[in-house]
Amino acid sequence: MTKTLHARPSAATDTTFAPPVITGTATEDALEILFHALLDVARRHDPELEDVLHGRADISSFTPEMLARALQVQGIWFQLVSIAEQNAAMRRRRHVERDQGREALNGSFAKVLAEASARGIGPQQIHALLKDLRIRPTITAHPTEGKRVTVLEKLRRIYLVLRELELPRWTERERNGLMNELRDQIELIWMTGELHLEKATVEREVAWGLHFFDETLFEMLPEMLLSLEESLAQYYPDETFEVPPFFQFGSWIGGDRDGNPYVTASVTRETLQRNALASLRRYRDGITHLGRVLSITERSLPVPETFRSELAHMLAESGDARAIANRNPGEAYRQFLSCVLRKLEATIARNKGARSVGPDYPSADGLINDLRTLEKGLADAKCGALATDIVRPVRRMVEIFRFSTVRLDLRENSTRTTKTLHALWKLRNGDREPPALDSPAWKDWLLTELARPRTPETSFEDFADRLPDDARETLATFALVGEMRDTLDREAFGAFILSMTRSTVDVLGAYLLAKEAGIFLDTTGTEICPLPIVPLFETIDDLRAAPAIMKELLGIPVVRRSTRWQGGVQEVMIGYSDSNKDGGFIASNWELYKAQVRLTTLGNHLGVPIAFFHGRGGSVSRGGVPTHRGIAAQPPGSIQGRFRITEQGEVVSFKYANRGTAAYQMELLAASVFEHALLSEGNGNGSRAEFDDALEALSGASRAAYVNLLQAEGLVDYFQAASPLDEISLLNIGSRPARRFGAKSLSDLRAIPWVFAWSQNRHVITGWYGVGSGLKSFIDVRGEAGEALLRRLFRDCRVFRLVLDEVEKTLLMVDLEIARDYAGLVEDAGIRARIFGMIEAEYALTREMVLRVSGDSELAQRFPQFSERLRGRLPTINQVSREQVELLRRYRSETDEDKREAVKSALLLSINCIAVGFGATG
C-alpha cells in the first residue's frame, strides 16, 4: 500500500518542485523524520521555502536570489533522501541475515563460499586463491565530487542519528534530544553552503580522501577480513586458512599529474607524508586504547617467559626502562605497549621531519612483529580470546594500511614523458632534433640508454639544471620514488600509470625516465625497475593495439626482469571513459572485453599473468555499473583473484561515507572477485564464436552511428551552447583543468566534463547513442534469425546483457522535451535542427530496439527499485533542468556584473542539484 506524504497539487506541473512521495518501503520512517526536520529548519530561516518543499511555490517567478535558496534546499533534500535510502538498505540486509542467515545475503562471502562448498570446490583451491588475491580500489579526486568535507561530516552525523532513532529504548525526552540534534545538523548544512567558494586545491583533495579513512575505512576493512575468516571457518570447518591483507586501497590524489599542473614533486612528497601521518596517528590511538584496556597484573596472571624476554629487550631498547616499569608496576603487557607507543611517537616525529628522540620503526614490519609478540604473549598466558578480539584488529589494521594508508600511484600523460625524453636527447646530442617516435632510431636509442650502466657522472642531480622546467619536474617526481621508499614505507607507492599509451616506445620511455632519476636497482649485476610501469590503454585504437604492444614489451629483458622482481605479474590499465567518448557505449564495452581476452591469452602464453586495472567512473557512460554484475561480466580467466578499479568522486562518498555501507561495499567487491575466480573462471559464457561475431557486428554499426554524430558539422558549437559545459568549471570541485594542455578541441576535452555536461542537459548521449542503429542494422542484415540471436545474446551473454540493461536505465534519464529546451540555447538554427534531429531520431530508435530485444513493453520493467527511485526524483530534477536553461540564457547574456553573479550562484546550485538528484556527475 502506498502512502503519500504532502501530495503534489495537480496544477502548476512545470513551475513547482515536487514534494517527496513516501512509498511505504523501508525508507518511509526515515524520510518522514528527515522531511519534517528540514521543514522546521526552513520555517526558522526562510519561511517562503516551506511552500517550495510542499510543492506549492511557482518558482518560475522567483528572483535569482530566491531561486538559489530554493535550489539549495532541494539539493539538501536529495542528500537527505540518499541517507535514508542507505539506512533502509542497511536495515534490509540486517533483516535478511537475521531471518535467513548470512548465506542468503547477496554480495557476502558466506553466499559465495556456501555455493563453492556445495559445488565441491576443495580447500586447496581456496588456499591458491588466497595466495594470489590482490584487490585494490583506487580513490581518485577527479572533478566529480561536489560535497565539501565539512558537509560530509554533517551528513555522516545525520546517518548516525537516524540509526539511533531506530532503537526502541529511548524515552520521549531522549528521542526529542536526538530529533533536535538531527535538526541541528541539517541547519548547519543549510548555513554551511553547498558550493566551494574557491577553486579546489590538491591539498584539500588529499584531506577529502583521508576523511573516509578516518571515519570508516581504518576500522571497517579489518572487519571485512574477519567476515571472510568467519565464512571460511563455517563452510570449510576442517581447514585452517591464513587470510593475508589482500584488500588495500590505492590513491591518485596528489600523484595524478596527467593534465594537472598543480601536482608537483613537492606536492606528492607532502601527500605521502600526510598519508603516512594519518595511519600512524590511527595506530597511536589503537595502541593507547590497548594500553588502557589490557590492565592485566602479574598477580592475577603469570607472564610467559618468552614474553618476559621480549619485554626485557623492549625496555632495554627504550632507554627508559625504570620509568616505564615504575609507571605500570607488575603490568607487563602495559609496559610492553608503553615501549611500542614510544617507538611509534618517535616514528611520527621522524615523519614530521623532527629529530628522532629514541628508537623508532623503520617500517610497518617492526610494528606488526611487536603486535604479533603481544598476541602470542596473551595466547601463551591462556588469553587467546583477548589476543584475537582486542589486539589482532590493530595488527590487521597495520598490515593493511602500513605506514602509508594508501598506495599512491603516479600518473602522467605519454605526451609529457616524451617531451622530457626529447629534452634528455638534446642534452646528450648537442641540441640535435630527436628521431621520430615511430622510427627504429628512437627505439634503438631508448634500448641503448636502458642498457647503459648508470654512473655517478650521469646522475640526475648533475644535469637537472640544464633541463627545461617541465622535464626537471618529471624526473624529480620519479626520483621521489626512491627517496620515499627508503625513508617512509616500501609500499608507499603503487605504480606509475602512463596514460594515453600508444606504442612500446612510450612505455620504454617511462622505464628510461625511472632509470635516469636513479630509482633502478642493481640485482646481481642486472638492473631492474622496482616501480611497476603500467600502460593505460584508453582509446579504441589503443585497446586494439594493446596485445601487440605488450607482446613486444614483455620480450624486452629489462621489462621482463623488472616484472619478475615485482612479483611476476604485469598490470595493464584499461580506460572506460575515453573509449566510450571515442566510439560509443557498445563499441567501448566490446573493445574492452576483447582486449582483456587477448591480453589474458598473451599473458598465459608468455607465462606472465596480466592483471587488469579498470579505469571506471561513476556514471554508466564511464564504466560505472553494479559491482557484482560488472565483475561477473568480465571475461573468464581475466581476473584470477587480481582486481583493481578506480573509485571516483561521488562514488567514494556513496560507498565509504558510512560504516555500514562501507563494510557492505568492500565485502561485495571482494566476494564478487571470489565468485568470479571460484565459480566463473571456466564459464565460456559470451565468448562463443557466434556471440563474438554478433557483438563485433553490433559494435561496428553502433560505432559508425556514434562517430557520425561526433563528426557532424556544428556538434562542438551545439554541445557548448546547449549544455553547461563551460559553466561546470565554475563549480570549483576539482583542482584539475577540464581540458588537457589548455586546448579547446573536442578531442582534447576530458571525458568527465563530456559526460557531466551531456547528463546535465538531459541528452545523456554518452550512455546510449548509436545503440539503436547498431541493433537495427543487425536485424536488417540478418532478419528473423538475427533478431532471435540478439534475444539469445540478451539471455545468455553476460556482457551484452549488462550493456543493454545499463542502456535501458540511461534512457530513463533522458527527457527530449527538456533537451529541446537546451537545444534552444544554440543560436544557429541550422546546427540546432541538424544535431537535435539526429539525437531525437536515434533516441526513438534506441528505445524501440531495446524493448524489441528485451521483450518488455516499458523501459526498466526489470529494475523496479531503480525506476521507482528515479521516478520519485524526476519531477523535481525536471523542473530544476528547465530553470537551468533559463539561468544559462541569462548568465550568458547578462552584462551587469552584480546581476550576473546572482544568476551564477543559482546556476551553479542547479548543476549541483541535478547531479545530486541523479546521484552522478561525470
UniProtKB/Swiss-Prot annotation:
Q: Which cofactors are named for this entry?
A: Mg(2+)
Signal peptide interval: none
Coiled coil location? none
Residues of the active site are: 142, 581
Membership in a protein family: Belongs to the PEPCase type 1 family.
What does the UniProt function comment say about this protein? Answer: Forms oxaloacetate, a four-carbon dicarboxylic acid source for the tricarboxylic acid cycle.
Q: Which UniProt keywords apply?
A: Carbon dioxide fixation, Lyase, Magnesium
* Catalytic activity, EC: 4.1.1.31
Pfam families per UniProt: PEPcase (PF00311)
Q: What class of enzyme is it?
A: lyase
A biological-process GO annotation: tricarboxylic acid cycle
Sequence segments annotated as region (Disordered): 1-20
Identify a single GO molecular function assigned to this protein.
Answer: magnesium ion binding
Official protein name in the record: Phosphoenolpyruvate carboxylase
Q: What is the lineage of its organism?
A: Bacteria, Pseudomonadati, Pseudomonadota, Alphaproteobacteria, Hyphomicrobiales
Q: A single GO CC term, please?
A: cytosol
Q: Which reaction does it catalyse?
A: oxaloacetate + phosphate = phosphoenolpyruvate + hydrogencarbonate
